[in-house]
């Protein structure tokens, strides 16, 4: 996988061969990747705004005022401007997940990774998070999303991958994947959820 011209996890040696990268060599590449987990991992002792500005200020060295301006714009994008000064414990699961998305976006990543971002949510709040993710995709954000939300995957993806026991068994466009899967396991999976 390449991010902004860098192969993730590897660097070329003096002979041009790819070798495993050290943690130090990976740090600049990692800073280009946002990650949103199943659990929101918000700091409970910090407000929504403080959660969002923490990494840009501490990791990127961004001025606090600039980080606040970016955070306020991101809160507007995820429709949580009114929660700026709230603590995570006062938010619904869907609201917390949208804060987690805003927090990742505050680092201005080239790529966003989502690990089952709706699996820990109540059914009523899933749509809030999927709508924000859809807007990101439509805005051109490159995303890799592990999900069982097949309607979302079908609508937003340009590639769909099916894994079984850690092995890719099917890959293709949404049309291919949902209408003409080639692997029997994929057909079984789709018949149970669609």
Where are these regions (language model features)?
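Conserved signature/switch motifs of ABC ATPase nucleotide-binding domains
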Residues: 86-89, 107, 139
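Helix N-cap at the start of a conserved alpha-helix in ABC-type nucleotide-binding domains
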Residues: 123-125
